[in-house]
Amino acid sequence: MRLRSKLVVLCLVCLSCLRLSAQERRNVLLSLPPFERAVVCIKHFEGLHGFKDAPYVGYGHQLLPGEHFTAAMTERQADSLLRADLMKRLMMFKDYGKDALLLAVLSYNVGAGRLLGYGKHPKSRLLRKIESGDRNFYHEFVSFCRYKGKVLRGLVKRRKVEFALFYIP
């Protein structure tokens, strides 16, 4: 009976959230501290990965050699792992000041190497533009919307949302 009452409360909360207009949802999201906003954004777009998504677990954590996380992790464990991963990426980009969180969120999805450069791949145009002081880098940011060479609408939407939430003029 106790579980049933918890489920009823959860359903009522969800229903009340559904009644919020798009503007109200945006205002609630914008009222969160920036790091929390980033966590919510990543959770929304990544979703909780299951067994078929290996080598990714939780909210998109890529398993590293020696790690033994499984897809059967709890939401709380996945949240904790996401926060730790995002904080590492934030530290990677801390020298970019007000753009650090924007770059951390992007790198969570595309990988830090795509931005910073690796091997024969040069540093991204996005970072070069930011380093030069050019604040007009919207097109460079949203250009990270390809998977296996194809533009994916879902990634275009994700980039637009990320830019709207984390770009500071």
State the predicted function of each range.
Residues 1-8:
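Bacterial N-terminal signal peptides that target proteins for export
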Residues 56-58, 102-107, 137:
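Structural recognition of the beta-strand scaffold that forms the well-ordered cores
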Residues 103-113, 145:
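Acidic helix/loop microenvironments that form the catalytic cleft of cell-wall polysaccharide enzymes
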Residues 20-49, 61-66, 73-92, 114-169:
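Long, amphipathic alpha-helical surface segments
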Residues 11-20:
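Hydrophobic h-region of N-terminal signal peptides that target proteins for export
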Residues 49-55:
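Short, flexible loop/turn motifs enriched in small residues
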Residues 91-102, 106:
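Short, structured surface segments that line ligand/substrate-binding pockets
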